[in-house]
């Protein structure tokens, strides 16, 4: 088995191997759609079909309830009507609307901010085929502009399933749980990252890894957008943390977690759970599975409170508050969590002019205040104060 030794912002691991008995789906296999999977995997299918990934793209003619924006009040940003909407993308944080343009779709000029229930301008131009559709579908054909199905269906993560549907065996379908950690993470990073294919495809530029399917090596199809350490860029903070949503993969490949074989599925279940972000259990419980008090993985204190210096049960005592701060922009002031798992030291963040986890929560305080507070804590850790 091959494991990666490390990564920096903008790089993917180059080693991929398979666990015993696991290989890519047969080359002759074709895509059959998620409904074919439901015949044998009904409980999993029933959970999946309620997830956001299974419903992020909707046709409002079939699902008029999919449109959550308020069209009852006039707004200068809204220069279109519901009848012009051919496709709806999103529902949790934002919702975007697209009109049919020949055999393609084009964005309409306003998007709905779900959190604040207000319209915001949407300046994206160009067709969705090069920007969006490859990740929001199964088996998108760049020549014909056709799909096996819209949304993240079973075969997006398991590969083409015709052989398995005809004669189910463990060896004729990709199971990400049986892949080595790098290949398993590739399945998610293919879409949860900012990057580009290695070259033009059919003379066109795409923003998703054309040709990749589960079980292949993502690095052969996709190059994460690069970052120059110490500089703030459109996509990256100076320390390499992602500044925008959908950069979880760019973050994660920098992490010690990734280097040690932790995968996305160690924390998330893409088939759906009752927990936020489809976590396998509440976030704190996931972290404490490997990082309980006196754990060899740290923290080495006797209690969690001695490590966090916040009251048990408070927001400040949650592992994600310090190790996964909300610093990546989704829309307006709606932020999502970083996935490098680094503690961003306030004094370093101040030098780099970027957010830190302390003042992200304590919005009325300064990095200098945070540094002084960290210095005064019992169980003092110098690395929390300066690098």
Task: Give residue spans per PLM region.
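Primarily the internal scaffold of c-type cytochrome electron-transfer domains
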Residues: 24, 28, 35, 43-109, ...
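Conserved catalytic alpha/beta cores of large enzymes that bind or transform nucleotide phosphates
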Residues: 132-137, 142
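Signal peptide processing junction and immediate N-terminal pro/mature segment
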Residues: 18-24
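A short, surface-exposed interaction/processing loop segment used at functional sites
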Residues: 106-131
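Bacterial N-terminal signal peptides
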Residues: 5-17
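N-terminal secretory signal peptides that target proteins for export/translocation
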Residues: 1-2
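Short, contiguous clusters of charged residues that form electrostatic/catalytic patches at enzyme active sites
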Residues: 130-133, 255
């Amino acid at each position: 088995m091959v494991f990666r030794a490390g990564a920096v912002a903008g790089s993917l691991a180059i080693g991929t191997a398979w666990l015993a008995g696991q290989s890519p789906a047969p080359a002759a296999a074709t895509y059959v759609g998620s409904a074919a999977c439901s015949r044998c995997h009904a409980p999993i299918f029933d959970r999946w079909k309620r997830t956001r990934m299974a419903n992020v793209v909707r046709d409002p003619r079939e699902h008029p309830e999919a449109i959550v924006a308020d069209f009852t009040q006039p707004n200068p940003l809204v220069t279109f009507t519901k009848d012009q909407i051919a496709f709806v993308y999103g529902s949790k944080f934002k919702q975007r609307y697209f009109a049919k343009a020949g055999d393609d779709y084009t964005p309409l000029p306003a998007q709905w901010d779900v959190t604040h229930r207000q319209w915001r301008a949407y300046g994206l131009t160009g067709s969705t085929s090069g920007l969006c559709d490859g990740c929001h579908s199964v088996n998108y054909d760049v020549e014909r502009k056709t799909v096996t199905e819209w949304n993240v269906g079973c075969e997006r993560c398991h590969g083409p399933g015709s052989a398995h549907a005809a004669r189910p065996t463990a060896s004729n379908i990709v199971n990400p749980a049986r892949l080595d950690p790098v290949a398993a993470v590739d399945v998610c990073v293919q879409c949860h990252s900012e990057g580009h294919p290695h070259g033009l495809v059919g003379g066109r530029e795409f923003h998703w890894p054309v040709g990749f399917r589960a079980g292949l090596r993502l690095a052969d199809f996709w190059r994460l957008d690069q970052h120059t350490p110490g500089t703030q860029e459109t996509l990256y903070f100076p320390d390499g943390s992602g500044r925008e949503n959908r950069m979880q993969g760019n973050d994660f490949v920098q992490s010690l977690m990734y280097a040690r074989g932790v995968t996305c599925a160690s924390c998330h279940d893409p088939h759906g759970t009752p927990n936020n972000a489809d976590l396998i259990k509440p976030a704190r419980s996931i972290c404490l599975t490997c990082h309980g008090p006196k754990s060899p993985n740290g923290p080495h204190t006797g209690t969690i409170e001695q490590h966090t210096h916040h009251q048990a049960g408070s927001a400040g005592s949650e592992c994600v508050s310090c190790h996964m701060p909300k610093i990546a922009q989704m829309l307006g002031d709606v932020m999502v969590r970083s996935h490098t798992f680094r503690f961003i030291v306030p004094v370093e963040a101040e030098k780099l002019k970027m957010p830190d986890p302390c003042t992200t929560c304590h919005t009325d305080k300064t990095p200098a205040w945070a540094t002084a507070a960290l210095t005064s804590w019992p169980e003092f850790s110098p690395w929390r104060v300066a690098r």
